[in-house]
């Protein structure tokens, strides 16, 4: 269910908003199921539902939950959080009954009978944002903590939820505001002092300090975005090159079927793993070759689609295969690199490299490191059979995307990076206008745009459609 129209919520009178309700725990068999209510009628609904006349704030009360005819729907605990001292800033009720879809749905239906409306996705969090209980970064951190794919990502999300990321952004906003005031004062009162503030170096120094801090926060945010999103790694190559074996080795389990029959993999296969703290979204693909097999041909088409969506492409080849009459590994690498999005990366993976030092290596297709270097590629030697080189591969993947999160990293999203980059660009414009053209009005305008871009991160300046997209991606009940 979509989030209610932000225009109908932002800065609304709380009494005019409907009381909302939703199941806040996963549906299915479980020990406890929680239904959350928020709004002006939440308290009265709880009283009618239980037959109680009063609930003390922040005190758990054991109650039976009744249908209109007096039959018992369920029994459990009622928790009352009186606004504004609640998550949403409104009166909040939590009904903690037994888990299970039937009981939970019956209880929720009764709550709707008493006047509550179904909450939209993320609507509880939106009301918390609307009532200044949390900012946009903190609201997003709730969803990021729930969706975290690693312990490091979860910890980073909790730090963002506690306000650490917002604090960094707000400190930068404060600096920008003071800088704008300084510049605009120099413009509005040019004759008040003998000193030319646009030329004395003070504003330039403050501006450069702000630029340096923006770059530091941007670097931190890049690590946070990698922690949150991970990278998409696609395994491609000729049939029987060892792609599926490599996926199994990285995943630590037999996820893909491996046989000696070329063309065993007919479709893409996804697996998500966390290695060295970095989340890898792995995609195994069908071997690339000319074929008359209709099903295999469809798989190859899907493989090429997956390649275009890769952050890093692993072009796997088998060093024991004689490819004299086929396309060479380097030719295939260049062909695949041409299909990658701009600024994406390709690594050549030499599988069965443990056999290169054996007498049986005669006639193998191993590519010289010099030839690879001259073509601008990098090769990692691995053995899917023994596991040799796998650690080197993981370290190379981390290095390629610059993944080295600090101990106290903060979760970040792509939109945060976009806003920080735009802020940095506007500050660079301001610096040029100041140092080259001495154009105070243009400096002030660039600083205003920088402040606006930075304010988008915490929600100080955010379009309603953006808010709808962000909160609409949340769980029902959050």
From Swiss-Prot:
Binding site for K(+): 240, 259, 261, 264
GO molecular function terms attached to this record: GTP binding; GTPase activity; metal ion binding
Gene Ontology biological-process annotations: tRNA methylation; tRNA wobble uridine modification
Domain TrmE-type G, chain residue ranges per copy: 230-402
Record Pfam families: MMR_HSR1, MnmE_helical, TrmE_N
Similarity annotation: Belongs to the TRAFAC class TrmE-Era-EngA-EngB-Septin-like GTPase superfamily. TrmE GTPase family.
Name of the protein this chain belongs to: tRNA modification GTPase MnmE
Organism of provenance: Psychrobacter arcticus (strain DSM 17307 / VKM B-2377 / 273-4)
